[in-house]
Structures are given as C-alpha cells and as structure tokens.
Amino acid sequence: MNFFKRLARKVNSAKVIVFRPESEVLDETGYVPPRPAKHYIPDWYKKIPSHVDRNSDVNPRTQEKDHTVKGCVPILDAFTSGYIQELNMDIDVQRSGEGAVAFHWPRQNPWEPVRAPRHPAAMKGFVHPDGYDSNPYLWMQPFEFNVPKGYSILITHPFNRYDLPFLTMSAIIDVDVFPQRAEITFYLKSNFSGVIEKGTPLFQVIPFKREKWESETAEYNNAWRLRWVNLSRNVFGGAYKKNFWHKKEFNEKPQPARCPVTGATEQHGDQDNVR
C-alpha cells in the first residue's frame, strides 16, 4: 500500500442511510429511492476525451500527454458522492404569453411531483440566482431520510450539473433526530419550456458526520511548499490518484424480497440498530 494512503488508513465499517417512503402508494408513483450518485454520471462527461490531443507530443514537465478535465479525480468524486433522487415521470413545462409557468404530468399518478411554496411570499428578500425565475418551486419527493446518530445530510443541486434546466437549493438537515420528508426548493431557468424527462437527477444527498472544527492560519514554509509541489505536480496525470486519493463508497443494499401473496417486504429496524 502507498505510504500516503497507509499513513491515513482507518478501519471503516459501512454506515446506513435509510430512505423510508411516506406513502403507501409508492409503487403507483413510479418513484425509486435515491440511488448511489455513481449511476448518474452524465453522458456528456463520459464522452469527453481523456487527452487534450491524442496525437500531441509528451509534456516535458509531466512526461505524459496532457490530460483533459476528465482526468481530474476530485471532479469525478463530486459526481459520484452520496445519492441522487431522480424524477419519477416526464414533466412538461409550459409558459403562457405573459410568462406564467404551468407544470403538466400524467394525472393518473397519485403523487404531485412539483408545486409552489405554500406561501407566495416565503422567499421574499432571498436573492435568487441570475438567469432563473424569481419564484421558486418545490420538488415533492416521497421519502424520509434517516442516518445514524451524530450524522446529518447535505441536500444540494447535483454537483457539476450546470446543464439542467433548474437549480436546486442547498440545505443541511439533522435527519438523525428529525427523520422527516423534505420538500426541496428549486428555481427554474428563465424562459425554459419543454420536458424535464423521467430519470433526470433532481438533487444530491450526502451524509456527513457532525464534528467541531476550528480554523488556523499557518506561517509560510518554503520547504513544505516545495515538498508538496513536487509530489503533486502531475495531478491530472495520475499523481493525486496514485499517492493521495482515497476511495469513497456509497452503495445500496439489495431490495428485500416481496411476498407474492401479501406484497409485504422485510422492513428496516429502528434507527438505533443502524450502524
């Protein structure tokens, strides 16, 4: 094992995040619980070539061909961290001549996927992002989130997904003690009309441990700087992944078997029993 990885090695046991449906009619809504974000890497990212120019000469500094952003492991880590809630149906977004927005979806679906905030003035004074409608909406997802004691979750717009026609707001919730269903606020791109397709990632859920942090500013140390500059000078070429990077694992347990007679499934135990 590499020295740097061995230096920071710890014994890890899997923590469990539970997605519990609030509605008994979940199967009729088309919703699936949030899944590992690694399943939602966008196709446009996958199509990016690994090198700036496959026919170019070797970079004399790195002794390798120049890599594109696809070789940046921290960006890939952002794409694949946590869990993603996807849209359960096609939503047709239409605008009137005055610019009023209307959302349309199959009315036989018993779950309302989108609605406006309960009070129109709820976001008054909040600076909305440029290029988006000033009035926000809510993703009405049907799951409660629950994590082990001492943990919280970050809910945010899918990392690096600037191509989506909406922007989901970020929030942190202590769902270890407040395992409630969250209504997720989002802004729609100005003048967007069209279909937001089923399977579109709506928001990313990342569990993290609550800990006390303090900041400090260290004095400049040239020897320290040169040491790390020399070690990390070829980050895109693989030095970071080879010497420093640690694998992050966000997986899902197999779904419990369903009784063919009653339709009942094995249930999760109390959160106190979750590691």
Map each language-model feature to its residues:
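Non-catalytic terminal segments and appended small domains
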Residues: 1-181, 185-275
